[in-house]
């Protein structure tokens, strides 16, 4: 959870509320507040609210839920002389920029601004891999024309924090910790993205800014750039930053014109609101409270949406900084937060239905317990297996193949558990004899051209002289204990020897097969000892097992 450090006095000044009121309201907004040192608050913010990673964003949310302000007034976008030419930068193709006038940076706000930048880098930016942010002193820009393009690693710049010393970007990557952390994110074939103004490098995103445009106490206006690998995320991040800085008293937002072959937008920031509709009936079903469209709209406005009733529904315009709003359910959650979960109160449901196990599950568990009691060990294998083994088992015509397998050895769904059972016996054939194992799981096979998923049970015995009776006896014991009347008849099976194979039937329905594995199958699976095995359908068994 992101923890935001902010001066208590500053937050009280921004909201007009006492620390006690702030703690209560922030708790409703899913935040926790601590004061580890006098005058400094640590606010643990929910990670889906990056708009609250700075004092202005926290204040905006708190004033809304407190009823001090409602909705959100988008700032007017003023034209500026700034233009940004975007060349093609394959490894980091997207860039957006904006100007915010009247920010008036002081020592305390500079600390928060840097913190805001790094929290966004770590969360939305995935440690700068997705997006990176640059803050620049607008007055220090060498030119109103800015350019974003690839240049070689030998390009010289004045990295931030080096007192104006000039070095090549290659030298910086080797000398600075940020070079080792972020240098590989956009470096490719001896080239890297650079941001230039008046022919001078003002940034090498996502690694470092230049000393030329350093932001410091006394900076009045900011030029902001956001670069990244996702156009949507770049635009949203810039909107979050601009909307937060626009909350500062006297601040104004200016647009930057974008041009060139790599430009995605004509100008930025976008600051566009998303349109949505909410049915108060949905709120009632989810929260158990009946709200009129007017009441629902009021609660949404307190959560800083622009909302109004319309024909029994609520028209909602979601502000661009609320990137956590993905659908109707998120708006319902906002209403719950506005009302207060403590005000909703618990209520017993009109009907109560207790969960219980399926009858089939009871049968499956009983069978497994019986086999363990008969000296068998349960194993678990993957449903995916090798097409070579499926062919060796004689089940190729029934196999369901994976269209895009990661490995060829795991490209077919097992049509019978006997395949993976023999694999297990192969891996354990040099252990103390007899080796007795079973598996209950899913087999997937083609039936009338369509894939069918069936729960089955397979058991096998590997021994120096393993025979039909070694599996017949435990299987018969299980069926009799389960109260199943069954009959056995001679049959054929692709994996079992002729004359040593039997089909088990229950009520005329085939339950499964018992048999001794063919020598050629043993050889294909790498088995050096005889194996007797059986496979039955647990689904059929459950249908014919008495419920008494």
Curated annotation (Swiss-Prot):
* One record GO biological process: phenylalanyl-tRNA aminoacylation
Specify one Pfam family.
tRNA_synthFbeta
Its main localization is cytoplasm
> ATP-binding among the record's keywords?
yes
* Keywords tagged on the record: Aminoacyl-tRNA synthetase, ATP-binding, Cytoplasm, Ligase, Magnesium, Metal-binding, Nucleotide-binding, Protein biosynthesis
Task: Please state where this protein is localized.
Answer: Cytoplasm
Domain (B5): residue spans on this chain: 271-346
Listed EC numbers: 6.1.1.20
Give the organism, scientific name: Aeropyrum pernix (strain ATCC 700893 / DSM 11879 / JCM 9820 / NBRC 100138 / K1)
**What's the subunit arrangement here?**
Tetramer of two alpha and two beta subunits.
Top EC class of this enzyme:
ligase
By sequence similarity, the record places it as follows: Belongs to the phenylalanyl-tRNA synthetase beta subunit family. Type 2 subfamily.
This protein's GO cellular component annotations are: phenylalanine-tRNA ligase complex
Give the binding site residues for Mg(2+).
Answer: 324, 330, 333-334
> Which cofactors does it use?
Mg(2+)
Which catalytic reaction applies to this protein?
A: tRNA(Phe) + L-phenylalanine + ATP = L-phenylalanyl-tRNA(Phe) + AMP + diphosphate + H(+)
**Protein encoded by which gene:** pheT
One Gene Ontology molecular-function label = magnesium ion binding
Q: Kindly provide the name given to this protein in its UniProt entry.
A: Phenylalanine--tRNA ligase beta subunit
**Top-level taxonomic group:** Archaea
């Amino acid at each position: 959870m992101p923890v935001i450090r902010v001066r208590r006095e500053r937050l009280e000044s921004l909201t007009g509320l006492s620390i006690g009121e702030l703690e209560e309201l922030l708790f409703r907004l899913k935040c926790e507040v601590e004061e580890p040192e006098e005058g400094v608050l640590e606010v643990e913010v929910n990670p889906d609210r990056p708009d609250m990673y700075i004092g202005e964003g926290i204040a905006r949310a708190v004033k809304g839920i407190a009823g001090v302000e409602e909705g959100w007034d988008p700032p007017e976008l003023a034209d500026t002389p700034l233009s940004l030419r975007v060349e093609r930068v394959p490894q980091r193709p997207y860039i957006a920029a904006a100007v915010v006038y009247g920010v008036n940076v002081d020592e305390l706000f500079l600390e928060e601004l840097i913190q805001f930048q790094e929290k966004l880098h770590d969360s939305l930016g995935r440690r700068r891999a997705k997006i990176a942010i640059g803050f620049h002193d607008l007055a220090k820009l060498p030119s109103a024309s800015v350019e974003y393009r690839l240049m070689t690693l030998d390009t010289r710049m004045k990295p931030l924090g080096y007192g104006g010393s000039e070095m090549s970007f290659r030298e910086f990557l080797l000398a600075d910790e940020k070079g080792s952390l972020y240098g590989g994110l956009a470096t490719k074939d001896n080239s890297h993205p650079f941001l230039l103004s008046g022919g001078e490098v003002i940034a090498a995103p996502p690694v470092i800014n230049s000393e030329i445009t350093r932001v410091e106490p006394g900076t009045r206006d900011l030029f902001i750039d956001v670069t990244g690998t996702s156009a949507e995320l770049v635009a949203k991040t810039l909107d979050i930053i601009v909307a937060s800085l626009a909350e500062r008293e006297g601040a104004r937002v200016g647009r930057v014109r974008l041009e060139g072959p790599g430009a995605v937008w004509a100008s930025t920031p976008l600051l566009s609101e998303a349109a949505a509709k909410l049915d108060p009936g949905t709120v009632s079903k989810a929260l158990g409270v009946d709200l009129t469209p007017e009441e629902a709209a009021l609660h949404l406005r307190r959560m800083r949406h622009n909302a109004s009733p319309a024909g029994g529904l609520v028209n909602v315009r979601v502000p661009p900084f609320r990137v956590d709003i993905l659908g109707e359910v998120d708006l319902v959650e906002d209403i719950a937060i506005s009302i207060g979960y403590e005000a909703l109160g618990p209520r017993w449901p009109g009907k109560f239905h207790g969960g219980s196990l399926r009858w089939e599950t009871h049968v499956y568990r009983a069978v497994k317990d019986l086999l363990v009691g008969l000296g068998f060990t349960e194993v678990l294998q993957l449903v995916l297996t090798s097409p070579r083994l499926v062919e060796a088992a004689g089940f190729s015509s029934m196999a369901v193949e994976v269209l895009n397998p990661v490995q060829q050895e795991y490209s077919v769904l097992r049509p019978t558990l006997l395949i993976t059972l023999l694999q297990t016996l192969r891996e354990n054939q040099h252990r103390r004899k007899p080796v007795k194992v079973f598996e209950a799981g899913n087999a997937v096979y083609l039936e009338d051209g369509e894939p069918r998923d069936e729960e089955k049970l397979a058991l096998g015995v590997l021994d120096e002289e393993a025979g039909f009776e070694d599996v017949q006896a435990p299987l018969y014991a299980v069926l009799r204990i389960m109260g199943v009347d069954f009959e056995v008849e001679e049959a054929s099976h692709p994996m079992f020897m002729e004359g040593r194979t039997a089909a088990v039937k229950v009520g005329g329905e085939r339950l499964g097969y018992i048999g001794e594995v063919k020598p050629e199958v043993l050889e294909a699976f790498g088995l050096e000892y005889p194996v007797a095995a059986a496979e039955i359908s647990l689904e059929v068994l459950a249908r014919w097992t008495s419920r008494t």
